[in-house]
Amino acid sequence: MTMIRKEVDFGGRRLQLETGRMARQADGAVLVSSGDTVVLVTAVGRREMKPGQDFFPLTVNYQEKAYAAGKIPGGFFKREGRPTEKETLTSRLIDRPIRPLFPKGFMNEVQVIATVVSVDRDNDPDILALVGASAALAVSGIPFNGPIGAARVAYIDGKYVLNPSYAQLTTSQLDLVVAGTRQAVLMVESEAQQLSEEIMLEAVMFGHAQFQPVIETIEALAREAGKPRWEWVAPVADEALGVQVREKATPLLQEAYALTEKQARSKRLEDVQQAMAVEFGSDDAGRGDMVRGLLKKIETGIVRGRILDGAPRIDGRDSKTVRPITIEAGVLPRTHGSALFTRGETQALVVATLGTKGDEQIIDALQGESRDRFMLHYNFPPFSTGETGMVGSPKRREIGHGRLAKRAIAAVLPTDSEFPYSLRVVSEVLESNGSSSMATVCGASLALMDAGVPLKAPVAGVAMGLIKEGARFAVLTDILGDEDHLGDMDFKVAGTEQGVTALQMDIKIDGITREIMAQALQQALAGRLHILGLMNGVLSRGRGELSDYAPRIITIQINPDRIRDVIGPGGKVIRALTEETGATIDIQDNGTVTIASVDGEAGAAAKRRIELLTADVQVDTIYDGKVAKIMDFGAFVTILPGRDGLLHISQISNERVSDVHDHLKEGQAVRVKVLEVDRQGKIKLSMKDIPQ
């Protein structure tokens, strides 16, 4: 196999695609590089579909190797383990834009693996992995209606920046990833600092325009190195069976979709499916699959047709109405902050917990170790949809929804100096019928304010949908689960009254114009403002006081040279401090001391003791001390915690002293004056002329 390499200028950097040198037994393998960041992406597909397969089994795995950054993994086994959150999120980021581009009816297993093999400090490998997945599929011969391009867009000083460096992102008001084909945007993932809808939309269009040269480069690579496309044809439909099922099932399904309550509707749909399976199914698994597929098409036609004809939606609403909302704050007695947010048949119980710096999450990434003071975890138990299932580690969807909600809230959090707490928010989805991630955003904002966190502004979120047939289309506000599955777009927008803080978009079809996206954003703004109005009626700002069960944090600054005095030999001093006061104490290398305690008096006591431990001894100042040890030549007196001075025998009294024991005893309280502190820090004391 001949090695073929293509290059393109992409945001001022050279993007290189190479195939034919590595992983040659994969159907498609492309090495993507920019700077010193290199990602190997492979695509492999099974030629035969598994019997009875009724869904498309696409698997995407993004993995970062420690050696890529010149590191050895930690832990006992010293090798990479379960996927990190970054790896899981990037796997989803790749999956979302490529999945809609496989032909309908294609049920063969496909696996895409992106492996980061080298990484620098300027180029994030996620965009390279996305581009590489597109290129690997394009050269593989697997049926795929690509390629796609992808780009990251920042907004700095009023200008859009293509593929910013890590350093540039720290000053950017926007971090947006957009992916799509030559004609259409397919996926957007972003977080923003309360930017307007117009700025967000222009960022999407800017990114789409800028990655066109990447698509052209992938097409050129595929023309030279691509394998012949598989001779795959879509399963042939049984027209006679289709007519029979349609005649029988259509009126029954129309009756089912006239039911506005989810559980009743689901039960009726299940009954229809069972009846059709009995009447038209057989022992032939293929025929049963065909019947299920036909029913799905009929359902899709009913729901979409009603909406485009202007009829009420599944639950009786028009296209712009938000479902009924009920809001409760402070619903749990012992938590630091809590809220119960219910929107229609979607409900989230959200709890906020305040912690100390020691509770921050330590993230060991390829780019280096960092700490995260804000964590948001989203849980989606099976009972939320009336089902049974496994309960355990979070799935990819839960991690993705949690990150979206976190992005939405992060823009309004106070700085560490304004509110020196670590924050953990947990969303328990108790009921779900669409838009549970946006219910989490609303609940998280309320729970944090209930906990006393001074947010810059409340945040709300709403999920939008789209039904489009030819020139006719309808944008839907606050979509249901069925509208998500049967629609053409899932468009989630979160933000404040001032602007957008997070936007996530997944589009399943071509032809979504700028005008349609603009309408969706404006309709989402109206929905968001409506929800914020209801939220503000319950809680519009952080409560003035923290929960009685939340830690009180005191922050003081000490001389870094005195840190050792607070810690003591082997941690003896700080251990005694925490045990005796009950406070948690954290000391940074720069001398910042954080004292946390649920009991305010305990925190104040710990503060006083640390101030004494780190206080500088002042010459000519009188101290209340305690005799620590008596010697023949005098006594050592403790004047501050950990600070002893020498009281020489000649300084005990104005009269001559022959035996120190005649005047002092160990443990005796005495008042002494500091005469001198020499260069070595040794302290000389005197009791002369000091009233005892």
From Swiss-Prot:
One of its GO terms (cellular component) is cytosol. Disulfide bonds: none annotated. Mg(2+) binds at residues 484, 490. Its cofactor is Mg(2+). Its main location: cytoplasm. It catalyses: RNA(n+1) + phosphate = RNA(n) + a ribonucleoside 5'-diphosphate. Residues 551-610 form the KH domain. InterPro entries: ExoRNase_PH_dom1 (IPR001247), ExoRNase_PH_dom2 (IPR015847), ExoRNase_PH_dom2_sf (IPR036345), KH_dom (IPR004087), KH_dom_type_1 (IPR004088), KH_dom_type_1_sf (IPR036612), NA-bd_OB-fold (IPR012340), PNPase (IPR012162). One of its GO terms (biological process) is mRNA catabolic process. Residues 620-688 form the S1 motif domain. Its EC number is 2.7.7.8. It is found in: Cytoplasm. Keywords: Cytoplasm, Magnesium, Metal-binding, Nucleotidyltransferase, RNA-binding, Transferase. NCBIfam families: polynuc_phos, PRK11824.1. Belongs to the polyribonucleotide nucleotidyltransferase family. PANTHER family: POLYRIBONUCLEOTIDE NUCLEOTIDYLTRANSFERASE, POLYRIBONUCLEOTIDE NUCLEOTIDYLTRANSFERASE 1, MITOCHONDRIAL. HAMAP family: PNPase. Involved in mRNA degradation. Catalyzes the phosphorolysis of single-stranded polyribonucleotides processively in the 3'- to 5'-direction. Component of the RNA degradosome, which is a multiprotein complex involved in RNA processing and mRNA degradation. This is Polyribonucleotide nucleotidyltransferase. It comes from Acidithiobacillus ferrooxidans (strain ATCC 53993 / BNL-5-31) (Leptospirillum ferrooxidans (ATCC 53993)).
